């Protein structure tokens, strides 16, 4: 329990932004990747990543790396963050970037150097129309470098739900078709 960064905590902050919902994964050389949200209102959060060295110094600059920069994620949503087993991280979330009062699930894979493997603002799990895709969970197959994303899918009124999933290539291409796979079909909750 010895404090390795001194008696006082290291504060990562901005004079113009609020940071919330932090998550940390182990990276290379004793370093860590910090993922957090940057809320700018109730439905205007973004996601950012920082890398800290063993002394708590920011390695990717004060602004870090933007994971999701469209600002259409609810500020109360906590992104899912998992290590990739290769000193990087996987981040999943849902947002309403289409502007149609529906949310869709997205995933991003960031390397230990801060490079994004997937397109800017993440890869979308499903392009199925007139559906919400909430509460994504992410997993990574280190041997194949494939990413798996699973979510709860609902129709617009949210009276029915099911579990759907998608497999992504190392560069973020959908491998299970544009609508993903159905694991539990839509049905009314019991």
Outline where the language-model segments fall:
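Extracellular, repeat-based ectodomains that mediate carbohydrate processing or recognition
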Residues: 1-190
């Amino acid at each position: 329990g010895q404090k390795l960064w001194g008696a006082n905590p290291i504060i990562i902050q901005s004079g113009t932004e609020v940071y919330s919902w932090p998550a940390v994964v182990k990276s290379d050389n004793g370093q860590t990747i910090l993922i957090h949200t940057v809320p700018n209102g109730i439905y205007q959060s973004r996601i950012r990543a920082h890398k800290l060295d063993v002394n708590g110094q920011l390695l990717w600059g004060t602004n870090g790396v933007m994971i999701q920069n469209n600002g259409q994620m609810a500020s109360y949503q906590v992104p899912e963050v998992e290590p990739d087993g290769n000193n990087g991280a996987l981040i999943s979330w849902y947002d309403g970037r289409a502007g149609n009062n529906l949310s869709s699930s997205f995933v991003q894979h960031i390397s230990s150097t801060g490079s994004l493997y997937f397109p800017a603002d993440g890869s979308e799990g499903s392009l199925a129309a007139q559906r919400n895709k909430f509460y994504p969970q992410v997993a990574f197959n280190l041997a194949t470098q494939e990413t798996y994303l699973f979510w709860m899918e609902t129709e617009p009124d949210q009276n029915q739900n099911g579990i759907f999933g998608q497999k992504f290539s190392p560069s973020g291409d959908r491998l299970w078709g544009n609508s993903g796979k159905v694991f539990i079909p839509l049905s009314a909750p019991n």
